[in-house]
Amino acid sequence: PGFADVTVVDLPDAVLRGDEPEPFDADTELRRVAVHAVGDKPLPHGVGATVRYAPGSPQARCLEDRQGVLEPVLAGRGPEPGGHSLITVPLRARGATLGVVAFHRCERPEPFEDDDLSLAQELAARAAICVDNARRFTREHTTALTLQRSLLPRGRPDQSAVEAAYRYLPAQAGVGGDWFDVIPLSGARVALVVGDVVGHGLHAAATMGRLRTAVHNFCALDLSPEDLLTHLDDLVARLDHGEGWAAENAPDSGIVGATCLFAVYDPVSRRCTLTRAGHPLPAVAGPDGTVEFVDLPSGPPLGLGGMPFETTELELAEGSSLVLYTDGLIEDRNRDIDAGLERLRRVLARPGRAPEEICEAVLDAMLPSRPSDDVALLVARTRVLGPDQVAEWDLPADPAVVSRARTAATGRLAAWGLDDLAFTTELVVSELVTNAIRHAAGPVRLRLLRDRALICEVSDGAATSPRLRRARNEDEGGRGLFLVARLTDRWGTRHTADGKIIWTEQRLPSR
């Protein structure tokens, strides 16, 4: 008020989006972002209005010449009603012109002088640095948000084990490193993952992308939950010590840290195996409305190294909802974790809702309009593969049983209406059962699952995995597994506490 009666700030939309401003010309449209007037003086253009400056006007000359313009006496030509003296100064920072600020005198009789122009230029220079910092933050925030959204799941994977819904909300302070995933596994199982990388911005989003990719790769190897977290822990430790991307692109980003919760659900046994690395406890909402927070060993956050991860196994009723989330859902500056968990329990206690409805109810009840920390939420309602979709046989370690196994398998395929897959399945059963009897010890089990694909599994007590190779012309064996791999859509090995399982998948014929 002691300097000007009216002050206005105009910026191009590109600056408001965080982009580099284009060169200014007569057609450049600006957005009025700030107005301050002494008293109740009416103004023709308020905040949010678009303005264009006439060629030759003080503002236009200011932007073209990138110099402050002093108009001591306007003689009624001022852009604001009643203005008689004007100073316009470009907002320049780091070599770029970001906009213009105009100071008007309407009520004060004294015109602006050269000393006033110097003061206005000093004020504008300081303000321009703040505007450019905000522009750069907006650009980084937008880039990080775009990167994170591109790294998060875009759709629901093709699996039958759970009905899933999820949400991600960025933080008010900036994009963080929260992520979630639903990953189909062999044997009709599914992996559910939620994680949280420490920090905000591009570094957190990029680190999240690396960890999410690593989890997918480890899942493809059919690692156990505790082994998967051990490998992920080692990866975070290497990032923390500045290997690869971290050393080249984020030398001053600080310590890399992350938490993670990893669960595997089997729709045949209804068993769910969970492990966590410093992550909040998951909740299980039963179909009857009961809610429990799973008592999981905490495990250290990822990156500390040297500590084993422990698992907990649950049997879930069909229709149970497994709720995984990051700490931003239950904790903020005004609420401790216990209060957040109790509120979450109350929200989940209402039965009969689909996962999408649960997500909406949880976010509405738990979060303000703009959370201080980013939030990832994953809700998975369990399904079950019924007895009519599963067939299994325990086989003695006798080569004579192979033909009986083939007959049993083709008979079950006929009952399922899958005769088109009988020939390939006979070959798969013959090869896998024969190898198990020949090379493994202990009992052999054959299992067929009719899910979105026909799954054939043969388990035995040996820990060694078969190796796919191309047999030489003089070799008497070694071709069976190669044929299995060529005739089926997918195959692999997963280890169990008692040995291993060799599995194959075939697409079901279209109806």
Feature map (PLM): residue ranges:
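GAF sensory/regulatory domain recognition
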Residues: 2-51
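Regulatory sensory and allosteric helical modules in signal-transduction proteins
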Residues: 31-80
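A short, aliphatic-rich beta-strand micro-motif
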Residues: 84-92
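Primarily the active-site beta-strand->alpha-helix module of PP2C/PPM metal-dependent phosphatases
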Residues: 113, 175-246, 250-254, 323, ...
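Catalytic core of PPM/PP2C metal-dependent serine/threonine phosphatase domains
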Residues: 143-165, 205-300, 309, 313, ...
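Acidic loop->beta-strand submotif enriched in PP2C/PPM serine/threonine phosphatases
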Residues: 173-177, 257-260, 292-334, 443-447
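Active-site-proximal, acidic helix/loop segment immediately C-terminal to a metal-coordinating Asp/Glu
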Residues: 201-222, 298, 316, 320-366, ...
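Conserved beta-strand-loop-beta-strand hairpin that lines the nucleotide-binding pocket
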Residues: 437-511
